Amino acid sequence: DYKSDMLTLQDKISIGKHWDNQFTYRRNKVKTNYFQDYDMNAQSNWGISSDYTYDIIGEQVSFHDEWNRLTFGVDYSKGRDNVLRAAGFDVNGNPVKTNHWYENYSFYIQEDWNFLPRWSLSGGLRHDRPETDQYTADFSSHTSKSYRLSYEITPKDTVYAGRNDFYILPGLDVLYIPQYGNAKVRPAYGYTDTVGYSHVFSDKTMFTFNWFRTKDEQSIGYDTSSKKYKNFNQGVSRGWNAQLISQIGSKWSANVGWAHLYSNVPGDNFSLGYSPKDKLTFDMIYHNKKFTGGLDGFYFIRRKNPVNSDLKGWPNDKYGIYNLSFNYEPRKDFNFYLKINNIFDKLWAEHTDVIWSDHTPGTWYSMPGRTWLFGVKMEV
């Protein structure tokens, strides 16, 4: 079971021609309850449950003119575990239970500056100052930097390069879920380098290419020996993606992309096949007055891990999923729609038990096969 209740309040105002202000408050309550009986006779039961509350308050101010855009602000966030959990022992040796929590203050500033007609420079700083309860590892404060330089070679060709630091707090489940949580886990941090190029063939067709490399100075992953989350060091991932976007005549549009990923990050699940080594995505849409129809999908190529290459951990390592959609809108307040997902009824999965334990092929979590959805939407 999964239940999420979210409340968001947001206020935006403009002050003159150059200043904007935005205030945001958000509260999200999330409850989950998962149970699995592996052998169908209650001998190998496994389950987890959680109940979290998240509060976020943000205040952002921005200034913009012809050459600059300056954004600065502060965010406050707090996560609280609503379930009493074992937290250790008091000074007298008695067991202690508590509702774990942590909070974070983030202060940031970013400047986008078009300092010459064909040059633009972006730079930013973000300082995080987290605090935890007394039973959780101390999270040290951290300052992240980012910058990017873009150059317009010609009116149709643009190149850019940059670097972005990251600092990611562990989730409440990573810290406190009894089955695999670890209250000693600390935030992940590192940086990503990126280089990109874009070319505009015409006002209707554009090509983009991006290469990236991410280095983890400290990451968070799952340790199969201890069956707990922990921190790892010196992970690296890199890849590229290319995309062609085109408007074909007045009624057709198309988009095709290819992404490639290599990752060597201890404790992640890329080597187990959760993320694709290569992935092709596409869509083609036809629009004519009141009628719209489209075909979209992806082709997935999984990385073969030499360590478990003989284990069939997934239904397929190469597969395509394709979807059709049709919309007819006789008037603005009335719409008929038909969606056919996974039109070839392909067996595929995004999660599996096979690679985590001694389960046999077939103990994966299949995604839906061919599904039909027909409906009518009317606005009053």
Mark where each language-model region is.
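Repeated loop/turn-to-beta-strand initiation elements of outer-membrane beta-barrel proteins
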Residues: 17-21, 67-70, 118-121, 156-159, ...
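Outer-membrane beta-barrel domain signature, strongest for Gram-negative TonB-dependent receptors
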Residues: 1-80, 194, 203-208
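Conserved C-terminal beta-signal and adjacent last beta-strands/turns
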Residues: 195, 273-380
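Membrane-embedded beta-barrel scaffold of Gram-negative outer-membrane proteins
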Residues: 17-36, 152, 159-160, 168, ...
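Gram-negative outer-membrane beta-barrel transporters
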Residues: 114-122, 212-215, 231-308, 344, ...
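Extracellular loop and loop/strand-boundary signature of outer-membrane beta-barrel proteins
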Residues: 1, 6-10, 38-49, 89-98, ...
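Signature of Gram-negative outer-membrane beta-barrel scaffolds
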Residues: 71-157, 169-170
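Surface-exposed extracellular loop regions of Gram-negative outer-membrane beta-barrel proteins
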Residues: 80-87, 131-137, 143, 151-194, ...
